[in-house]
Amino acid sequence: MRIRSCVAAAGVVAVLVTAAPTASAAPTVRFLGQTTLPHAWQFEGTTVGGLSGVDRDPATGEYVLISDDRSYTNPARFYTADLRLDGSGVHDVRITGAHALRHPDGGTYSSPPANDGRTVDPEEIRVDPVTGDYWWSQEGERPKTEGPVVVQPSIQRATRDGAYVDALPLPANYAYTADRGPRRNLALEAIAFSADGALVTSVVEGPLLQDGDEPTAERGALTRLTVQTRDGAVVRQHAYPLEPLFAEPEPGPWGPDTGVPAILADPKVPGRYYALERSWVPGADYKVRLFQVDIAGATDVRDQDVLADDVRPVRKKQLADLHDFPLPVIDNVEGLTWGPRLPSGERTLLLVSDDNFAAEEFTRFIALALR
C-alpha cells in the first residue's frame, strides 16, 4: 500500500478447526539490527523500491521481494535477493534477479491511467511450500469515481520467473461492489501459508465497507481474516480487531491509514499467527507493531454479510513496538518473513519497509529474534 509521508490435507483442516493453541507465555522479541538500500538503486533496468512483501525460501535460503510499483516506474515485478541474517543483524543485501509479473495472456501489467482492466496493485509474495512457485496478492482497483474499470483483488500463483499459473478463488465478501467489500487501498495484502502448504490465510487490510468505519483515536475497528485450502475452499473466517489510531490526526489533505500489511503462520502451532499492524497518522508519522494472534474460540463469520454485534474476534497479544528499538526512524514497514534460526534456538524475523519511491523514505531491512 502507498502511504503519503510528511517529511489439501483434510486432516490438517480438522486439526485447525478443533485444536486450540497450547497456553504459554507470549514470546519475547529482541532487536538484532538493520540496514538500508540506496535510494533509487538500479538493477537490470529497474528501480528497486516500493518493497511491500518479502519471503524466504527455506529450501534455498533465497529471499523474494515484491514491489508495489503499479507499472508507473517499471512493469509490476518482484526481485530475488541474498542476504546474511545473524545475531548481529542484516548484512550484505544483494539483489540477484528481477522478474516481471505476467498477466494471464503473457504480457506485463498496465499502469492505472491505461484504464484497460490490466492494472494490479502488488502487495505480498509467498513461496509455496509444496511447489516452490510464488503466490502473490494484489489489491486491485476500486475507482474513486464512476467510470474507470474496477479491478478485483486477487491472490495469484506465478512460476519462479513470473509467468501466470492460476488464481485462488476468494470469498465473495473480498470483492468490490458498489456498497460492499474492501475499501479502496485497504484490500487484500497479508497472506500466509501453513507450514505444509495445505492452508492459505489472508487478511483484508482494513474493515469492509459493510462492517463499519475505519479506526479512530478513540476506537479500533474489525477487519476479516480468512483461512482457505489451497484450492480455495473456505475453512473459516474471523473478525480481526485493528488497534485505534495511536494519535489524533492533524488536519490536512491526507487522512490516517492503518491496517494489517503482513501475517505469518506459526509453523509449530496451528491457528496461531504473527501479524504486523502499520499505522500512519498525519502529524505523527508511523507506528508499527507486531502481534501474536490466535484464532481458537473466535466466531466463524464466513456467513455474516455484516459482522454481528456479539462477534468474538481473534485474540491478540502485542509482542513489539518498533519505536522501542534503536531505529533511526520508523518507516512504512510492510513485509514480514521468517529468517534462519540462530544458534541460540531463537527464530528470526526479517521486516522490510516500502519507500514509496520517495527520496525522504527508506528501503530498510530489520532483523528481530523471537524466543
Give the location of each predicted region:
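Sequence/structural signature of beta-propeller domains
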Residues: 2-6, 24-371
